[in-house]
Amino acid sequence: FGSGLKDLWKTVVSLRNKKSTVRYLISNMFYRDSLNGLYSFGGVYAALVLDWSIVQIGTFGIVAALAAAVCSWLGGKWDRRVGPKPVILLSIIVLTAVCVIVVGMSRVSFFGIPLAEGSSIPDNIFYGCGVLIGGFGGILQSASRTMMVRHTNTSNSTQYFGIYGLLGRATAFLAPALIA
């Protein structure tokens, strides 16, 4: 255990010379927590704001998971072609836009525009948002790993991915705390 902590400390100290890696790890820590917040609170939002049943929420989850599978595969091809940075940036932009849409929507209005009583527009929009969250969330996660690979070499990949995993957990409390 002690030697593992020594190795961890040496790796952390070695990051002083890798400013790009440090910036990436810090930004990844926050956007990964944001993505986890989106995943966690999608069902809560659907139940409390849109008054969805458990079956509708389950269907939403399945649709988002299927979108994640297909889009992650397509995103991998895109990542291979253009590299992870533009893939990560576009994914964050799309997911931010989805958050704006979700915040501007309720059962009775869309960005302040009243909807007819019983309108299915909020449901359809939220399903579309679920596809985008699942799809671009999957793309974001896979491109983030590709980016981490580019910040490592064969001699330090285990240590760097360990820090990557640790930092992903370090702020896991933020999204629930900020939303609550």
Report the location of each language-model feature.
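Hydrophobic core of transmembrane alpha-helices in multi-pass small-molecule transporters
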Residues: 114-139
